[in-house]
Curated annotation (Swiss-Prot):
It comes from Physcomitrium patens. It is an enzyme of class 2 (transferase). Its EC number is 2.4.2.60. The gene is THI1-1. This is Thiamine thiazole synthase 1, chloroplastic. GO terms for molecular function: cysteine-dependent adenosine diphosphate thiazole synthase activity; iron ion binding. One of its GO terms (biological process) is thiamine biosynthetic process.
Length: 357
């Protein structure tokens, strides 16, 4: 099949096409070899419940363009009603993922495959993605060491293949792709510009998070009467990154209340040791709270890994399956996992998934 670059690789030019043969893992854009899933194919499905547009005429006149009329109050009501409905829905949820960097997004994506699991993502920044919008030192390319490239195949992110690693031409391509797929799923809600100020603790178990608007959380020294809100959860996944003003907040709070002994911080950089250690030590550190991503290095003293991102993705996936295990659901760790995918939203990535969807 032939896919227009305008819809897949924006910025390559109107005359460039991304050609992909189903059953083949290679593609070519302007002479650069790219790779996508070997078995990827666009699946046809029933029309979604809501339409992308009420108007089917593509030949509109840009010189005399007119929008449909609307009352300002309708805009306010639509935004407010939906947000408040989401807050009510997720006031008591299955999993809260704190931090929407590459590990948190990968975790939420994996969890969202089960449409019966409610997932709330809490991100203090207006723009989710953490450090995954760029590679190292503000450079564009994202490096992912093998075999983590299989996750890129699943979510349909093109890359250039090298011997032991792959290169995504811009890190934003990964982040925007996984977010667009994840947030389209009805069992997921992203609460960005919201900070997790504290944890809900019952006995020896983490039972949710204390939330507030990020701007309030950042200005408690001048705003003394801004009480927070809460989200109860069966499982909290802390993916708050390495130490910083809003970094490693989950494990630092556990240390301050004596639920863990220490947070030694990450050691100096060693890419080869770091990525294996991050995935290996992703775990439930106390009942009800799983730690993933670079926050794992803070609690275990693992080396920092620098600008390689594979461990973030796989650590996030492992955290998701730890959460599924904690919920008593099928998971990869117990060897009984069969993803219940959203057939109307995802690209088939394996023959088995295609057959079961």
């Amino acid at each position: 099949m032939s896919i227009s670059a305008a819809g897949v690789a924006t910025g390559l030019g109107a005359n460039v096409e991304l050609k992909s043969n189903v059953g083949s893992s290679s593609s070519s854009v302007a002479g650069v070899r790219l790779f996508t899933s070997r078995k990827a194919q666009l699946r046809r499905c029933a029309a979604p419940a809501t339409s992308a547009s009420l108007y089917s005429d593509a030949n509109y006149d840009l010189n005399n363009y007119k929008f449909a009329p609307i009352k300002e109050s309708i805009v306010a009501r639509e935004m407010t009603r939906r947000y408040m409905t989401d807050m009510i829905t997720h006031a008591d949820t299955d999993v809260v993922v704190v931090g929407a960097g590459s590990a948190g997004l990968s975790c939420a994506y994996e969890l969202s495959k089960n449409p019966n699991v409610k997932v709330a993502i809490v991100e203090q920044s207006v723009s989710p993605g953490g450090g995954a919008w760029l590679g190292g030192q503000l450079f564009s390319a994202m490096i992912v060491r093998k075999p983590a490239h299989r996750f890129l195949d699943e979510i349909e992110v093109p890359y250039e293949e090298m011997e032991n690693y792959v290169v995504i031409k811009h890190a934003a391509l990964f982040t925007s792709t996984i977010m667009s797929k994840l947030l389209a799923r009805p069992n997921v809600k992203l609460f960005n510009a919201v900070a997790a100020e504290d944890l809900i603790i019952r006995g020896d178990r983490v039972s949710g998070v204390v939330t507030n608007w990020a701007l309030v959380a950042q200005n408690h020294n001048t705003q003394s009467c801004m009480d927070p809100n809460v989200m109860e959860a069966k499982v909290v996944v802390s993916s708050c990154g390495h130490d910083g003003p809003f970094g490693a907040t989950g494990v630092k709070r556990l240390r301050s209340i004596g639920m863990i002994e220490s947070v030694p911080g990450m050691k100096c950089l060693d890419m080869n040791a770091a990525e294996d250690a991050i995935v290996k030590h992703t775990r439930e550190v106390v009942p009800g709270m799983i730690v993933t991503g670079m926050e794992v290095a803070e609690i275990d003293g693992s080396p920092r890994m620098g600008p390689t991102f594979g461990a973030m993705m796989i650590s996030g996936q492992k955290a998701a399956h730890l959460a599924l295990k904690a919920l008593g659901l099928p998971n990869e760790l117990d060897g009984n996992y069969k993803p219940n995918v959203h057939p109307e939203l995802v690209l088939a990535s394996t023959d088995d998934e295609t057959a079961s969807a």
